[in-house]
């Protein structure tokens, strides 16, 4: 079955204190999500540590991402993408707090052996 959508048109109608996750595709070994962030910060010392590789595109907005072991945050702007290997510990240190929100497209997939 053919499925369609629009990341920007289908955004939540208001700002949220937490991130809003929408799964667009979920197949064995592959998950694609739209993530909407407004003022999202992962506290110091807490990290995402995922079993899958994650390719992330910043569709709209702006964000800062910290990779464990790096001394500086990475500033991400619209159109920037990053590939995070499985178990690459990372955290979001800042996203915009005003409208439009920060919109991410995240593709999670099984790492190569």
Question: What annotation goes with each model-predicted range?
Answer:
Residues 77, 86-113:
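Ligand-binding loop in jelly-roll beta-barrel domains
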Residues 20-22, 62, 79, 89:
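Short, acidic/polar N-cap/turn motifs at the starts of alpha helices
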Residues 48-50, 55-78, 93:
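A short beta-strand-loop-beta hairpin characteristic of the jelly-roll/cupin
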Residues 29, 70, 97-99:
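Short strand-connecting beta-turns/loops that link adjacent beta-strands
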Residues 1-47:
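A short, N-terminal "cap"/entry segment at the start of jelly-roll beta-barrel domains
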Residues 28-30, 38-42, 60-64, 88, ...:
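Short, charged/polar surface micro-motifs in flexible loops or helix N-caps
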């Amino acid at each position: 079955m053919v499925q369609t959508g629009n990341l920007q048109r289908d955004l939540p109608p208001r700002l949220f204190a937490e991130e809003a996750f929408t799964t667009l595709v979920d197949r064995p070994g592959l998950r694609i999500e739209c993530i909407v962030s407004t003022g999202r910060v992962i506290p110091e010392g807490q990290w995402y540590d995922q079993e899958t590789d994650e390719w992330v595109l910043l569709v709209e907005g702006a964000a800062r991402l910290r990779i464990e072991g790096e001394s500086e945050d990475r500033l991400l702007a619209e159109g920037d993408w990053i590939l995070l290997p499985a178990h690459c510990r990372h955290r979001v240190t800042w996203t915009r707090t005003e409208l439009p929100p920060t919109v991410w497209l995240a593709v999670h997939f099984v790492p190569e052996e």
